[in-house]
Amino acid sequence: MIYGIGTDIIHIPRIEQLINKYSTKFINRILGKNEITIYQSLSIKQQTNFVAKRFAGKESVAKAIGTGITSSLLLPDIEILNNNLGKPIVYIPNAAKILLNNKKLTEYKIDISLSDDHPLAIAFTVISAST
């Protein structure tokens, strides 16, 4: 059964402006520790697209959970990493797992798709669950 869906689209130049203006402070508000390590290994152009897709992805995950970004579910808490084939995998904090468990979801799967085509990045998330 589909528990929730979420989508988000972002204007990449907006992210670029925020990175240029706030630098590390902005990155730390968006990315988790593992994502920051990946971010630092990328070229400047790749960094901007990486952050834009992660921002859209995290927003779409929060929408699919049904809470949006809250004090108990912050952007850096959600990490989107890639497996060895490049597929994005969502890692959520215990607070989000508790949220889903409180909604009587014993088993769930989070699928996410990320894409960018300058000047836009988009993410789509589906949470499927068995009750």
From Swiss-Prot:
Pfam families registered for this protein in UniProt: ACPS
UniProt GO molecular function: holo-[acyl-carrier-protein] synthase activity; magnesium ion binding
Chain sites annotated for binding Mg(2+): D8, E59
Catalytic activity: apo-[ACP] + CoA = holo-[ACP] + adenosine 3',5'-bisphosphate + H(+)
Enzyme class: transferase
This protein's GO CC annotations: cytoplasm
EC number: 2.7.8.7
Essential cofactor(s): Mg(2+)
Transmembrane segments: none
Main localization of the protein described in the UniProt heading: cytoplasm
Protein localization: Cytoplasm
Keywords in alphabetical order: Cytoplasm, Fatty acid biosynthesis, Fatty acid metabolism, Lipid biosynthesis, Lipid metabolism, Magnesium, Metal-binding, Transferase
Transferase among keywords: yes
Gene3D superfamilies in alphabetical order: 4'-phosphopantetheinyl transferase domain
GO biological process, one term: fatty acid biosynthetic process
Function comment: Transfers the 4'-phosphopantetheine moiety from coenzyme A to a Ser of acyl-carrier-protein.
Family: Belongs to the P-Pant transferase superfamily. AcpS family.
HAMAP family assigned to the protein according to its UniProt record, in alphabetical order: AcpS
Protein name: Holo-[acyl-carrier-protein] synthase
Organism from which the protein derives: Orientia tsutsugamushi (strain Boryong) (Rickettsia tsutsugamushi)
